[in-house]
Amino acid sequence: MAARLCCQLDPARDVLCLRPVGAESRGRPVSGPLGSLSSSSPSAVPTDHGAHLSLRGLPVCAFSSAGPCALRFTSARRMETTVNAHQILPKILHKRTLGLSTMSTTDLEAYFKDCLFKDWEELGEEIRLKVFVLGGCRHKLVCAPAPCNFFTSA
């Protein structure tokens, strides 16, 4: 069974906040800048890197108290479908890192909540999680699938 996550975009800081459902009372959200290059060293990642969450294909920095280096996971199937009539998620996120106009924060948040995470939770697709890096994360992956090229053309 797939782990359940809360997902919320914070437009004030332009970060994606993630945390396991049920952690509201004890944990802080896992968050990180969209597309920012990481300047922290891999040694800054805590030894408790969240293996208890049973997530596959996530880098250890995803569980760091400082948050992940960048937005970096989705369902393989969803990455290949359109987010709207004209653009796919990697291109949208890449444009956001460049400061270009894309879908609104509200629309992007709705996409994650209603599409990606719903399928992940209800269909148990965690084994299909892939890692897509916006920026230069230096962290190795936990039980990672074969590497993917984030900017592969559609």
UniProtKB/Swiss-Prot annotation:
Gene Ontology annotations of biological process type: DNA-templated transcription; symbiont-mediated activation of host NF-kappaB cascade; symbiont-mediated arrest of host cell cycle during G2/M transition; viral genome replication
Top-level taxonomic group: Viruses
Pfam families on file: X
Mitochondrial targeting sequence: region residues: 68-117
Places the protein is found: Host cytoplasm; Host nucleus; Host mitochondrion
GO CC, alphabetical: host cell mitochondrion; host cell nucleus
Matches recorded under InterPro entries: Transactivation_prot_X (IPR000236)
Bias type Low complexity, positions: 31-43
Region (Disordered), start-end ranges: 26-45
Entry PTM: A fraction may be phosphorylated in insect cells and HepG2 cells, a human hepatoblastoma cell line. Phosphorylated in vitro by host protein kinase C or mitogen-activated protein kinase. N-acetylated in insect cells.
Keyword list, A-Z: Activation of host NF-kappa-B by virus, Activator, Apoptosis, Host cytoplasm, Host G2/M cell cycle arrest by virus, Host mitochondrion, Host nucleus, Host-virus interaction, Modulation of host cell cycle by virus, Transcription, Transcription regulation
S-S bonds: none
Complex and partners: May form homodimer. May interact with host CEBPA, CFLAR, CREB1, DDB1, E4F1, HBXIP, HSPD1/HSP60, NFKBIA, POLR2E and SMAD4. Interacts with host SMC5-SMC6 complex and induces its degradation. Interacts with host TRPC4AP; leading to prevent ubiquitination of TRPC4AP. Interacts with host PLSCR1; this interaction promotes ubiquitination and degradation of HBx and impairs HBx-mediated cell proliferation.
Family: Belongs to the orthohepadnavirus protein X family.
Known function: Multifunctional protein that plays a role in silencing host antiviral defenses and promoting viral transcription. Does not seem to be essential for HBV infection. May be directly involved in development of cirrhosis and liver cancer (hepatocellular carcinoma). Most of cytosolic activities involve modulation of cytosolic calcium. The effect on apoptosis is controversial depending on the cell types in which the studies have been conducted. May induce apoptosis by localizing in mitochondria and causing loss of mitochondrial membrane potential.
Name of this chain's protein: Protein X
